[in-house]
Design a protein with these regions (language model features):
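A late C-terminal transmembrane helix in Major Facilitator Superfamily
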Residues: 382-411
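Symmetry-related core transmembrane helices of the 12-TM Major Facilitator Superfamily/SLC fold
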Residues: 206-223, 418-433
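Helix-loop boundary and gating motifs at the non-cytosolic
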Residues: 45-95, 261-262, 266, 271-285
């Protein structure tokens, strides 16, 4: 009897220590493994601490380069005496590839048997792209480098989500995605600061050397993730191995997935309203106070990153308790409020404070988008293709946003533009409220 009590006390103490030493509760994963009967017949996940830490640092180091070098490309090519037309062509080509490559990139990850290998190839491709910019800044090579970078980014995002799902499984994927978002936000901010300082103190060319240096530890972190701990079926949202291969959905079947298409439409409207909002604020601030415009816009970018880093793990945990729908409604509701506040507020300090709302939506989306896709594609084997569909909707909305905002501003003024963008955001909120169902499986509700 005494031995029994000692074993119980040791078990409870061990679990408590593990929970207190990690923000992503590994006890959840271990409990799922011990239970042996997870919802949906999924193989229990029991990733090692080394693999989880490796994923943390991989996300940290690739965060800033995953979506592009941003304004650094324009600055660098301008110093190389490129015309604005040529710079625009390069950026437009990259944007076009990024838009059309979302679904093929997701489908490629679904076909892969090693998500870690795919992620490594994507990182190596971005390294080559950065070296191309630095070594040979002529139009053909820079164009090829920008296309390679855009294509690699289309694969890298789904690959990170697939590795995460393959490691921890559906039961605690919300916690894992929250942790990913935190490390990505911190990595994004620090890498941008490092690149900016490098460009200022050294040269614009040196920014791309820094990019390569950041990607070397990213590859080392990726290597720390144990390949045998990433379940390929789980990473694709596939049916359990004991079921027939026919249970895997055809790629076209996702186009009949009504909740997924509703969510894609809502995301398109959200980004149609959101993407041009901060640049429009920048234009308004510059006209009113050109001296402080750069500092104000920098603060408007940093504040949401801080909010994302602080809130993302909490959102991942709340998603398991509240469900997905309440958090999505909060995120969609924040955007029209933000747009209307920009109409009536001119004080720079308050403008920066309003960006807290942007941080809330960014934190929710960083967790909820892949999480909802994981819910809706579970058992289909098309998790990453589902991410690609939503990525295409997001990119379409974002690409149209600047044109819409620019037209409205030129014709009717900035107040009308902000009001119109807020109205578009409200339509997206209405669709989420009326049409978007709760996607959290009932068996995964927190107890």
């Amino acid at each position: 009897m005494d031995d029994c009590w000692r074993r119980i006390l040791r078990t409870n103490l061990s679990r408590r220590i593990i929970q207190e030493c990690s923000e992503l509760p590994p006890a959840n994963v271990e409990t799922a493994a011990a239970a042996g009967t997870p919802a949906g017949g999924e193989t229990p996940a029991a990733p090692s601490r080394r693999s989880l830490r490796g994923l943390d640092w991989f996300v940290f180091f690739v965060a800033d380069v995953q979506t592009g070098f941003g304004p650094f490309v324009s600055v660098y090519l301008t110093t190389q005496r490129w015309t604005q037309v040529d710079i625009g062509l390069v950026l437009s080509a990259a944007g076009f590839v990024s838009l059309i490559g979302q679904m093929p990139g997701g489908a490629l990850v679904d076909k892969a048997r090693s998500e870690r290998f795919v992620a490594g190839i994507a990182v190596a491709t971005i390294c080559i792209s950065a070296l191309t910019y630095a070594a040979l800044p002529i139009f053909p090579t820079v164009l090829a480098g920008s296309i390679l970078h855009a294509a690699a980014s289309c694969v890298l995002g789904p690959a990170i989500a697939a590795i995460s799902l393959g490691l921890v499984g559906h039961a605690v994927i919300g916690d894992r995605l929250g942790r990913n978002a935190r490390f990505a936000s911190i990595g994004n901010g620090l890498a941008a600061a490092a690149m900016g300082a490098t460009g200022y103190f050294l040269s614009a060319r040196a920014v791309f050397i820094v990019t390569v240096l950041l990607l070397i530890p990213a590859l080392l972190a990726l290597r720390a993730i144990a390949e045998n701990e990433i379940d390929p079926e789980r990473a694709h949202g596939a049916p359990p191995r004991h079921l027939s291969a026919k249970a895997r959905a055809r790629p076209g079947a996702l186009m009949n997935n009504r909740p997924l298409l509703i969510f894609a439409g809502c995301l398109l409207l959200f980004h149609l309203a959101n993407s041009a909002m901060l640049p429009l604020v920048g234009s308004v601030v510059t006209m009113k106070s050109a001296r402080w415009a750069t500092l104000i816009i920098a603060a408007c970018i940093v504040v949401p990153q801080i909010v994302v880093a602080a809130m993302s793990p909490w959102i991942g945990a709340r998603a398991q308790i509240w469900g997905r729908r309440p958090l999505l409604i909060i995120a969609f509701a924040a955007l029209p409020i933000r747009g209307l506040l920009f109409v009536v507020i001119s004080d720079p300090t308050i403008l920066v404070a309003v960006q807290i709302l942007d941080g809330i939506t960014a934190a929710v989306f960083a967790v909820m988008v892949p999480l909802v896709v994981a819910d809706l594609t579970r058992g289909t084997g098309r998790f990453n293709l589902g991410q690609g569909i939503l990525g295409t909707a997001t990119g379409t909305g974002a690409s149209l946003s600047a044109t819409l905002a620019g037209y409205l501003t030129d014709r009717f003024g900035s107040a009308a533009a902000f009001s119109s963008l807020a109205a578009v955001a409200f339509v997206g909120l209405t669709l989420v409220w009326l049409l978007m169902p709760e996607t959290r499986p009932a068996k995964e509700a927190a107890t």
